[in-house]
Amino acid sequence: MSEVDKAHLAAINKDVQANDTLFGKIIRKEIPAKIIFEDDEALAFHDVSPQAPIHFLVIPKRRIDMLENAVDSDAALIGKLMVTASKVAKQLGMANGYRVVVNNGKDGAQSVFHLHLHVLGGRQLQWPPG
């Protein structure tokens, strides 16, 4: 199943995900993940289906379903996610650069309705991405 197909299916089942997501289970340690960083507010872990030599996700522990639904009071937490992405990228040796992506909604190919940053690098990335 393609990532776009997964996103379309997730959008249909978004109300089901409202109670729990894959990322909620990772936060609660109910399913394994290769965790790189964790504190009280954020978690970073390797993507299970990497799209680049280095591909990790950064998520807030407090669930925001999608960027579109973020409110002013979420600003500090979203900023924290960006800073965490930068710190982890440095830790993983991505000094030559990397890309940060947020998929938002069905057309943005969001497949898990828990805000997350994709951080991709480890090679020369192309533009436009598609």
Curated annotation (Swiss-Prot):
What InterPro entries would the database entry show? Histidine_triad_CS, Histidine_triad_HIT, HIT-like, HIT-like_sf
- What PROSITE patterns does the record tag this protein with? HIT_1, HIT_2
One GO cellular-component annotation of the UniProt record comes to: nucleus
- Which Pfam families does the record associate with it? HIT
Q: Name one GO molecular function term.
A: hydrolase activity
Q: Which GO terms describe its biological process?
A: purine ribonucleotide catabolic process
Q: Which residues form the HIT domain?
A: 22-130
Which parts of the sequence form the motif Histidine triad motif?
114-118
State the protein's name. Answer: Histidine triad nucleotide-binding protein 1
What organism does the UniProt record list as the source?
Caenorhabditis elegans
